[in-house]
């Protein structure tokens, strides 16, 4: 059902208000839909959240094979992490609003890459680690984690909530007071917070370094120091999966269709 789902997702461009959600600089350019673009310049723009940016990064090596110059406009927090793996990719911050200053032949929304490249569930690229963190971030976070959790304690990274302005946040996030008793009961484990917006009482049961997580490179480097990640459906699950870290995903009864219909593991 993945190819059909992503095909239907393309209907967003047929909505009467579709143009309102696009940068005006894109409206007079052709939207790329998979045709040959050898020798041309393709502008790719991020859509939705940081998790979607990370999820779709698995398609960047396929973009490179098109023979086009690729420019990716994405969230500034994602740039250091993407730069590690894709030094050939020109990265532009969405926050800079610089699209009007660039020359390109065609464009595509990053969430259209699965439609262009995904023809079956078993050929989704990046089903093992497809991103890496910088050595600088790795060294820093290895030192911080060893400093705060000495010895060989089992280390678990946790995230119980996502961006509160997400339209489905009420269904995906868990109130901290709901998980607090469970964290209290576990012995011999060091819990590390992987999210922001952390209540004060969290520090009674987990190590909170959220103020130091400035970019996804920081978050990813902290994740690499964990033995396990437990998270709700937010960017953390995509980062952990992209780094090849063992992850338990907490899903609501009615969950995002991309996670599939059955089984204990997932292609993403």
Tell where the protein language model's regions lie, with residue ranges.
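Alpha-helical solenoid repeat scaffolds of the TPR/TPR-like class and their adjacent stem/linker regions
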Residues: 1-228, 233-268
């Amino acid at each position: 059902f993945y190819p059909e789902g992503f095909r239907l997702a393309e209907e967003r461009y047929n909505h009467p208000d579709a143009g309102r959600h696009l940068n005006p600089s894109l409206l007079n350019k052709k939207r790329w839909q998979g045709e040959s673009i050898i020798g041309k310049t393709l502008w790719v723009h991020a859509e939705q959240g940081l998790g979607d940016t990370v999820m779709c990064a698995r398609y960047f090596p396929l973009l490179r094979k098109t023979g086009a110059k690729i420019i990716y406009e994405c969230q500034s927090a994602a740039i250091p992490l993407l730069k590690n793996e894709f030094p050939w990719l020109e990265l532009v911050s969405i926050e800079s609003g610089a699209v009007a200053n660039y020359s390109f032949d065609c464009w595509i929304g990053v969430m259209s890459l699965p439609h262009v490249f995904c023809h079956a569930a078993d050929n989704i690229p990046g089903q093992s680690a497809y991103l890496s963190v910088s050595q600088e971030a790795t060294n820093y976070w290895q030192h911080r984690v060893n400093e705060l959790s000495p010895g060989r304690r089992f280390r678990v990274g946790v995230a119980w909530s996502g961006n509160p302005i997400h339209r489905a946040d009420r269904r995906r996030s868990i109130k901290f007071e709901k998980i607090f008793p469970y964290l209290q009961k576990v012995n011999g484990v060091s819990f590390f917070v992987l999210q922001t917006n952390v209540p004060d009482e969290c520090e009674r049961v987990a190590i909170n370094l959220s103020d130091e997580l400035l970019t996804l490179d920081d978050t990813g480097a902290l994740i690499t120091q964990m033995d396990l990640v437990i998270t709700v459906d937010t960017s953390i699950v995509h980062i952990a999966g992209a780094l090849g870290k063992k992850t338990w995903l907490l899903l609501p009864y009615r969950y995002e269709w991309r996670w599939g219909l059955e089984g204990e593991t997932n292609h993403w």
